[in-house]
C-alpha cells in the first residue's frame, strides 16, 4: 500500500479519530514498512506525544486499521521531528528502486533476505531509511532524500563482527 494512501486511510478510521481527540498534540513521527510477504501491504505509522514522551503506532492493513500499544521512546541525542508527508516527493517504490540499484552496483555478491524501511526526519533531513539484511549476515543501510532521491548516507556492516 502506498504511504500517502495508507495515511489517508488511517486519518479516516474511527479508531484513529477517537485516539486523536485525546492526543491532539501528538504528531506523525515515522512510517514503517516491512517488505516480507506477510507484511508488504501493511504500513505502521508512529505518532509521538511530546507531553508524555510516548509513541503510539497504528497499523494500516488492507482491511483494517488498529492501534498498537503505546511505548516509551528511546531517547537519543536527536529530538523527534514531525514527518510532514506533503514533503515526501519520492514514492516508496522509487526509493526502493534506488536502494536496490545501489546494492546491485556496489555489493553485487550480497543477496537480501529481508528488507524494511522507515520514513523519518533525521538531522540529515527527511529520508527513506532503508535496510537490507543479507544472506551473508550483513546489513546495508541507505538514507535517501524524500525530495530528490539522492543517497545522503549509507553503511555496510557485518552483523557477526559485532558479536565477536
Predicted features along the sequence, with ranges:
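Long, terminal "pre-/pro-" and other extracytoplasmic accessory regions
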Residues: 1-164
Amino acid at each position: 500500500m502506498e504511504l500517502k494512501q495508507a495515511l489517508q486511510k488511517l486519518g479516516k478510521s474511527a479508531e484513529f479519530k477517537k485516539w486523536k481527540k485525546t492526543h491532539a498534540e501528538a504528531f506523525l513521527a515515522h512510517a514503517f514498512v516491512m517488505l516480507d510477504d506477510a507484511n508488504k501491504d501493511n504500513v505502521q505509522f508512529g505518532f509521538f506525544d511530546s507531553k508524555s514522551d510516548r509513541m503510539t503506532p497504528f497499523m494500516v492493513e488492507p482491511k483494517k486499521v488498529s492501534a498498537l500499544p503505546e511505548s516509551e521512546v528511546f531517547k537519543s541525542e536527536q529530538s523527534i521531528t514531525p514527518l510532514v508527508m506533503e514533503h515526501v516527493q519520492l514514492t516508496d517504490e522509487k526509493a526502493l528502486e534506488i536502494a536496490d540499484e545501489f546494492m546491485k552496483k556496489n555489493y553485487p555478491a550480497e543477496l537480501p533476505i529481508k528488507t524494511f524501511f522507515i520514513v523519518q526526519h533525521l538531522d540529515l533531513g527527511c529520508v527513506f531509511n532503508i535496510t537490507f539484511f543479507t544472506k551473508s549476515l550483513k546489513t546495508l543501510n541507505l538514507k535517501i532524500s524524500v525530495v530528490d532521491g539522492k543517497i545522503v548516507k549509507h553503511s555496510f556492516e557485518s552483523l557477526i563482527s559485532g558479536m565477536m
